[in-house]
Amino acid sequence: MPYLLSFLLCLSLSPIWPLGDNPRAGDPFIIVNKATNKLAYIDDGKIQKVFPVATGKTNELTPEGTFDIVMKAKDPYYIAKDIPGGSPKNPLGSRWMGFNARGTDGSKYGIHGTNQPSSIGKYISQGCIRMKKNDVEYLFDRIPIGTKVWIVKSKKSFQQLAKEKGAIAYEKANEKVGFFYCNKLS
C-alpha cells in the first residue's frame, strides 16, 4: 500500500500529468524561440533537431503561447495571391502545418516552407514561421495533427524550456518512472 501511495503522489506531482499546455512526455513537441529565430523539434523525450527559422517583422506578428497543429498540407495553395501549390512563386513553399493561434482554424498561422530561403533567420514574416525546404519537409513527415507548438521569446536554452513543459527527461531524484524520477517514500 505505501508503494501505491508513493507512486500516485509522484504521478500527480510529475510534469507528465496531462494538464493544459504541457505535452505528454515522449510525444512530439515543437518550441519556437523568437529571441533566436530557432525551432526545436522534440520527440521521444529529447531534442531531436534544431532549425533556423524566420518569424514576424514585429514582435506582435508571431503570436506567443502554446497552440496545436490542426492542419497539414503538402504543396499548399496560397489564397491571398491565388498562387497554386507547387508553384515556385508560392511563398508558402512545399509544406504547411497550421496551428490554432488567436482563435484561428490553422489557415492563418503556420509553420511552412518559403520561396525565399535567404529570409531564414530574419524577422520578416507576417506572423508565420518560415523554414528551409528540407527542414520543413523533415518536420512535416514526423509530426502528427495535435502536436503542441510553444512559441516563446526567451534567453533560456531549448533544454531548459523543454524541461519546463515536461517535454524532455526530468531528473528529480533516485527512482526512474517513465520520463521523470521520484524519491521513494518508504
What residue ranges belong to the model's regions?
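Generic alpha-helical secondary structure signal
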Residues: 7, 45, 71, 174, ...
